[in-house]
Amino acid sequence: MSLQFNTVALLLVVLILLGVLSNNSSVTISAAILLLMQQTFLAKYIPFMEKHGITLGIIILTIGVLSPIVSGKIQLPHLAVFLNWKMWLAVAVGLLVAWLGGRGVGLMGAQPVLLTGLLVGTILGVAFVGGIPVGPLIAAGILSLFLGKS
């Protein structure tokens, strides 16, 4: 096995380092797995991940969000709770975020190179301004508003 030293491998190493420095385990683990895949016989599975990775990730994320409801740790609200203006605002924000995520998927599919900038910006935000990584889909959705892309 020979290691491939190219710009993609270098970018993945930089993302691993930035992930470690900013305590962003999602970026660290993702970049490390992709680097491992790129440098080994697992490279043949990269096109599969490229084609289905976002869908699989959204499925896993949705399972993670719904699990507390299924386990009983979070109770479904009574109907009266939906009359509260804060609940309606929460529903509206949820709709907005889902819409932005949809725009983000479209933008990332059309211009995947922008994902690197979004990841670096997210990592810098976590490392230096106390931010929390909310995910590249929402960031890409917000970026699509500035770029005028849908």
Curated annotation (Swiss-Prot):
InterPro entries per record: UPF0756_TM
Sorted UniProt keywords: Cell membrane, Membrane, Transmembrane, Transmembrane helix
Membrane topology category: Multi-pass membrane protein
Residues annotated as signal peptide: none
Origin superkingdom: Bacteria
GO cellular component, as recorded: plasma membrane
Keyword Transmembrane: yes
Places the protein is found: Cell membrane
Annotated transmembrane regions: 12-34, 52-72, 79-99, 123-143
Listed PANTHER family: UPF0756 MEMBRANE PROTEIN YEAL
Protein name: UPF0756 membrane protein PM0771
Source lineage: Bacteria, Pseudomonadati, Pseudomonadota, Gammaproteobacteria, Pasteurellales
